[in-house]
């Protein structure tokens, strides 16, 4: 399409090739983007990408499912857009890279919403139906938000963990790990939330500061003679006293059952005003100061010598219910960093305490566990029955003081575990749960789960690389995985358990498959309504249905099984090439997926893990409601455009925190405009170019055109290397430099004279347009993964017959002979041009010239620069954008310089060059010779620029 402008008389008289384009200067993104979203959906663009990619090697980015609750936030936008960039860049690299989005649907947050709306007394069947409806509604809302961000995917057929087939396959996955021997039932302290009334996964725990009473408590001597002997004394100097512990959880004292010392720490027997006190020797001075006592060390002994001594419970004198003794056990976990070097053990409320007591022969039935699931003590607990443990804290302190056992009490602020949903403090609480054993030897006698998972980490590529050590440390040190939860809205652990022994039914694997078949037809509701007699007949008198549900991290952690090889196996495959999530997922989805795949398949479910950071404001502060520094992606999209969010994400190093503010968005918008203006220039100057009709063969191009294509091809190779490694911010940085400096600041700047003033169909102009055609092909494709709306908009102008840019692959530039030498030569020329531009600016500042075309320059150059400059001949002036340019040879670099002089000639009305031949043709007194030739004769001859 040709649109020659004729806005003024000179242009009408002596026209130049100023063309227009339907690609507007202003993006008007908030208005146009929703139109593209609608068009992509109506025209089935995602399906067309799949059709175009069919038969290519697969690349699978498996979507970590967001939770189906609430509006999408900026963190969602970061995650989904990064995934979109990966998928689009892999498709354009020649892969078949489908994107199946998914949602995590079961679990506490939705159950809480249902309880809030309808109360806690709903029948189970109603909880299920309302939870499904709620999750569906939330998914549809989030789906709209993700589409608005320009994310292409199979939105019509996402995976949902609540779909019947996924629920059924999850039960089958449970059967797999039971069959392999990883699952056991036992009493163990687990993270317990009183508000949830359930165990929590490690990933559901967050830490916040909390102020609690900290107390030092004395356990009185129960075996004075043995104690004296342990310290090498014939007898204790006095009867009063005991061993001293320090704790920040007074509420655990009623459940104390043991004391722990380190075998190698030296303990001192200190004579004080409160009697003889046993404290770690290196803590004596600090403790005496804290207790406001004076003390003399009577004797010392290593912890190992004190093993098995017994001491009275500190509340023994307060109530007969506490008349018991606590034995001394040895534990390597005891330190002298704080406290007394003695740890009191309530095995029901601490993992190390529990393991220590069990190792010393304590059985499950021996363990005292007076705290109920709602956080209250059992009614029968002496002194504190029925109290909340938090309300009991000060009362325990008072009782210890009254019993003469309290040495010190203070307020103490420490980092403490909280439920991520309720933001309330949680505890470790021993409950009977189902576990996946990290160090259990499986049925086949192979490696343990921990060993297999660590090997899986070694075989995985990490982006950035530091993620590897982080996940490795978590797996190496984690406890057994608590699989069970005590809720309704979740996939059931569909076991039949013996009413007396607690053993699983001998046909458990077969029964799980029968349940899975029913769930596949009717959902998890099928288990809720199942009469045990249907499956186990008369055994129903001996066995009961297990009421536990699976940890929701098992839901999402088995998507490699029930999605990649289940509901979406025709599109996806196992293992996935990439999992991509925020850095919190090292203890979340990355973690649970690794454990389940290690149990089921003996390998990791992914070949690569990509981790991104969290969003912060411009000052590096975490976004929060209290600070009022949150940024809503919907608001930004509606005000500036989703493209600006996409460009911000792509241009930020996601391996750290992603800073965003209005000032940052302003800079991103300015960068976007520069790219858009470059595209507009390219499209406008190609609007009268038909490649089939006007293309010039490569070997006939002008030299600068060959350079521009060779340079662009070299840049594309670099960019594709970055895309391959998921390094997006260097892609954006290099493309912005390319648009503003390599194109806008150099090549396109030089090209304007030839494009505008050469004869419309001349070889010189068509050579430039042929190069621009290739550059536009290449540029739009490398922009498309992140500037998706803009690349598509420009593509429809550039290639109107094509359905979409997203079915294209990266551009195959024509080969330019001697490209390396050409790039090297023009790097020298651009360097010289920079010096000339600086000299011209100085002359302009001194009012010696106006525009650069008013100048004539003499470039003094040596060596390779001299050779490069002289090789351009008379075309050098076009490269320097001056009316005349000469080259003067000098001996060395020290003598190089640029002389600038104002031209003494007249300015051509058409090309604005100052030339001696302006007015040489009497009929055209304001026209220079080359413009006359370009308009009325065969046109000027150019070879280089």
UniProtKB/Swiss-Prot annotation:
It is an enzyme of class 6 (ligase). Its cofactor is Zn(2+). Its EC number is 6.1.1.5. Zn(2+) binds at residues 908, 911, 928, 931. GO terms for biological process: isoleucyl-tRNA aminoacylation. Binds 1 zinc ion per subunit. HAMAP family: Ile_tRNA_synth_type1. A motif ('KMSKS' region) lies at residues 622-626. It catalyses: tRNA(Ile) + L-isoleucine + ATP = L-isoleucyl-tRNA(Ile) + AMP + diphosphate. ATP binds at residue 625. This is Isoleucine--tRNA ligase. It is found in: Cytoplasm. A motif ('HIGH' region) lies at residues 66-76. SUPFAM superfamilies: Anticodon-binding domain of a subclass of class I aminoacyl-tRNA synthetases (SSF47323), Nucleotidylyl transferase (SSF52374), ValRS/IleRS/LeuRS editing domain (SSF50677). L-isoleucyl-5'-AMP binds at residue 581. Transmembrane segments: none annotated. One of its GO terms (molecular function) is zinc ion binding. It comes from Burkholderia orbicola (strain MC0-3). GO terms for cellular component: cytosol. InterPro entries: aa-tRNA-synth_I_CS, aa-tRNA-synth_Ia, Anticodon_Ile_BEm, Ile-tRNA-ligase, Ile-tRNA-ligase_type1, Ile-tRNA_ligase, M/V/L/I-tRNA-synth_anticd-bd, Rossmann-like_a/b/a_fold. Pfam families: Anticodon_1 (PF08264), tRNA-synt_1 (PF00133), zf-FPG_IleRS (PF06827). Keywords: Aminoacyl-tRNA synthetase, ATP-binding, Cytoplasm, Ligase, Metal-binding, Nucleotide-binding, Protein biosynthesis, Zinc.
């Amino acid at each position: 399409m040709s649109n020659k402008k004729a806005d003024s008389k000179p242009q009408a008289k002596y026209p130049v090739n100023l063309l227009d384009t339907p690609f507007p200067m202003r993006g008007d993104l908030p208005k146009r983007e929703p139109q593209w979203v609608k068009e992509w959906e109506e025209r089935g663009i995602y399906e067309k990408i799949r059709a175009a990619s069919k038969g290519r090697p697969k690349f699978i980015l498996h979507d970590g499912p967001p939770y189906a609750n609430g509006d999408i936030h900026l963190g969602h936008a970061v995650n989904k857009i990064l995934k979109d960039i990966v998928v689009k860049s892999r498709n354009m690299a020649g892969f078949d890279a489908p994107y199946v989005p998914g949602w995590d649907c079961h679990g506490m947050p939705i159950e809480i919403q249902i309880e809030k709306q309808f109360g806690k007394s709903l029948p189970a069947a109603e909880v299920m139906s309302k939870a499904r409806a709620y999750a569906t509604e939330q998914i549809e809302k989030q789906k709209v938000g993700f589409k608005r961000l320009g994310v292409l995917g199979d939105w019509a057929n996402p995976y949902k963990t609540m779909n019947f087939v996924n629920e059924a396959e999850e039960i089958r996955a449970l059967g797999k790990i039971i069959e392999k021997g990883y699952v056991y039932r036992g009493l163990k302290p687990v993270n317990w939330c009183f508000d949830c009334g359930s165990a929590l996964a490690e990933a559901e725990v967050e830490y916040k500061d909390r102020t609690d009473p900290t107390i030092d408590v004395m356990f009185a001597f129960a075996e004075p003679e043995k104690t004296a002997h342990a310290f090498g004394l014939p007898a204790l100097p006095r009867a009063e006293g005991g061993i001293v512990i320090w704790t920040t959880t007074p509420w655990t004292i009623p459940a104390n059952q043991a004391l722990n010392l380190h075998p190698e720490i030296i303990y001192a027997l200190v004579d004080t005003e409160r009697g003889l006190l046993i404290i770690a020797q290196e803590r004596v001075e600090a403790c005496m100061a804290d207790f406001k006592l004076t003390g003399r060390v009577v004797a010392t002994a290593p912890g190992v010598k004190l093993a098995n001594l017994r001491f009275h419970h500190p509340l023994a004198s307060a109530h007969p219910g506490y008349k018991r003794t606590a034995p001394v056990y040895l534990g390597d976990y005891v330190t002298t960093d704080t406290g007394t070097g003695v740890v009191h053990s309530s095995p029901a409320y601490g993992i190390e305490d529990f393991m220590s007591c069990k190792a010393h022969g304590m059985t499950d039935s021996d363990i005292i566990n007076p705290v109920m699931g709602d956080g209250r003590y059992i009614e029968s607990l002496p002194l504190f029955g029925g109290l909340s443990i938090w309300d009991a804290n000060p009362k325990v302190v008072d009782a210890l003081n009254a019993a003469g056992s309290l040495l010190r009490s203070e307020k103490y602020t420490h980092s403490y575990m909280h439920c991520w949903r309720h933001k309330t403090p949680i505890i470790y609480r021993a409950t009977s749960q189902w576990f996946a054993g990290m160090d259990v030897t499986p049925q086949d006698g192979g490696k343990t789960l921990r060993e297999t998972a660590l090997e899986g980490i070694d075989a995985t590529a990490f982006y950035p690389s530091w993620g590897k050590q982080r996940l490795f440390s978590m797996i190496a040190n984690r406890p057994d995985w608590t699989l069970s939860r005590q809720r309704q809205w979740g996939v059931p652990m569909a076991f039949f358990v013996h009413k007396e022994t607690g053993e699983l039914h001998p046909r458990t694997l077969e029964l799980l498959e029968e349940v899975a078949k029913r769930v596949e037809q009717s959902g998890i509701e099928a288990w809720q309504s199942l009469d045990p007699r249907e499956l186990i007949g008369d055994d129903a008198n001996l066995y009961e249905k297990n009421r536990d549900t699976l940890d929701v991290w098992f839901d999402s952690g088995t998507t490699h099984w029930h999605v990649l090889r289940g509901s979406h196996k025709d599109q996806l495959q196992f293992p996935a090439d990439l999992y991509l999530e925020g850095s919190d997922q090292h203890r979340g989805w990355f973690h649970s997926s690794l454990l389940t795949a290690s149990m089921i398949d003996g390998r990791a479910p992914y070949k690569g893990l990509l981790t991104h950071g969290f969003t912060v404001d411009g000052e590096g502060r975490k976004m929060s409601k209290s600070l009022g520094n949150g940024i809503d992606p919907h608001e930004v999209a509606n005000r500036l455009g989703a493209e600006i969010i996409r460009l911000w994400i792509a241009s930020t190093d996601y391996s750290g925190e992603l800073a965003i503010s209005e000032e940052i968005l302003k800079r991103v918008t300015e960068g976007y405009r520069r790219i858009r203006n470059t595209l507009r220039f390219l499209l406008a100057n190609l609007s009268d170019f038909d490649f089939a009709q006007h293309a010039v063969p490569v070997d006939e191009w002008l030299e600068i055109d060959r350079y521009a294509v060779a340079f662009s091809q070299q840049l594309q190779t670099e960019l594709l290397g970055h895309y391959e490694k998921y390094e997006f911010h260097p892609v954006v940085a290099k493309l912005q430099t390319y648009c503003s400096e390599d194109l806008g600041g150099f090549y396109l700047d030089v090209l304007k004279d030839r494009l505008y003033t050469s004869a419309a169909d001349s070889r010189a102009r068509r050579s430039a347009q042929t190069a621009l055609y290739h550059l536009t092909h290449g540029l739009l494709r490398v922009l498309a993964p992140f500037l998706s709306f803009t690349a598509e908009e420009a593509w429809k102008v550039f290639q109107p017959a094509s359905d979409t840019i997203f079915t294209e692959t990266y551009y195959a530039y024509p080969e330019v002979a001697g490209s390396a030498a050409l790039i090297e030569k023009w790097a020298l020329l651009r360097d010289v041009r920079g010096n000339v531009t600086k000299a011209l600016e100085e002359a302009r500042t001194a009012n010696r010239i106006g525009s650069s075309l008013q100048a004539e320059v003499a470039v003094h150059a040596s060596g390779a620069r001299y050779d490069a400059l002289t090789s351009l001949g008379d075309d050098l002036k076009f490269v320097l954008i001056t009316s005349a340019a000469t080259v003067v040879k000098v001996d060395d670099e020290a003598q190089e310089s640029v002389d600038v002089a104002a031209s003494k000639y007249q300015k051509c009305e058409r090309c604005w060059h100052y030339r001696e031949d302006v007015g040489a043709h009497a009929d055209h007194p304001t026209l220079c010779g080359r413009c006359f030739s370009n308009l009325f004769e065969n046109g000027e001859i150019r070879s280089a620029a």
